Amino acid sequence: MGFMTQKEMAPLPDVHQLSDEQTTLTVEHLNLYYGNKQALNDISIRIPKNQVTALIGPSGCGKSTLLRCFNRMNDLVDDCRTEGDIRLNGMPINDPQLDVAVLRRRIGMVFQRPNPFPKSIYENVIYGLRLQGLRDRRLLDDAVERALRAAALWHEVKDRLSDNALTLSSGQQQRLVIARAIAIEPEVLLLDEPTSALDPISTLIVEELMGTLKQHFTLVLVTHNMQQAARVSDYTAFINQGKLIEYNRTDDLFTSPTQRRTEDYITGRFG
């Protein structure tokens, strides 16, 4: 796969030596509470630019909660509060003066199950662009083709852009959702178990797509599939009980974990 070749050709910097220029998201001493229950405990992590970072851990460990901190999806949860600092290229994400809609244009998200709108394929892709006020048909056409090509879907749908998106297969729908997310050219793409509802062939297509997308975007992936994390990610963070247990280059974490809990998890002793 292309991204494996790139990983082999260019040694990745150590997670503890990432400069600000190499970092897209910076998290420092993050705590998150649902009411009186603490879900994230003193998490500090740097997410490198133009790489795939996987968040792994057992169900309920806090990895999806952490992911949703990056675009403030947790704001939608009643009685949720956060402490600490999260920055997107230096911009404080939790600033109460920040327009969350602007943040979510800079940080796109793809969920576990494909969620295309019950509109045409074309209208799905341009949805975010229309919200931004873009009306020029030529520019919209160009954006649709560019996004669908980037999502490896263009050749499958270019002659049926007016068809309802719900007529696509589940794998095609998920790639359409990715195209919709990247059409507005975000800096970061959050992927919350994006292949868990897909068949093996569709899963492989999406995994290969991640290797291409990271050339233009920073990707953060939540996955229960450790083999998937090992295949597609450059860096992996192991989270358990709301704490960051270990964070390292993926190859190092899976072959030479420094924490016993990490080794126990990746070898199947618990989780």
Curated annotation (Swiss-Prot):
This is Phosphate import ATP-binding protein PstB 1. The complex is composed of two ATP-binding proteins (PstB), two transmembrane proteins (PstC and PstA) and a solute-binding protein (PstS). It is an enzyme of class 7 (translocase). The gene is pstB1. It comes from Pectobacterium atrosepticum (strain SCRI 1043 / ATCC BAA-672). It is a peripheral membrane protein. Part of the ABC transporter complex PstSACB involved in phosphate import. Responsible for energy coupling to the transport system. InterPro entries: AAA+_ATPase, ABC_transporter-like_ATP-bd, ABC_transporter-like_CS, P-loop_NTPase, PstB-like. Belongs to the ABC transporter superfamily. Phosphate importer (TC 3.A.1.7) family. ATP binds at residues 57-64. Its main location: membrane. Residues 25-266 form the ABC transporter domain. GO terms for cellular component: plasma membrane. It comes from the Bacteria. GO terms for biological process: phosphate ion transmembrane transport.
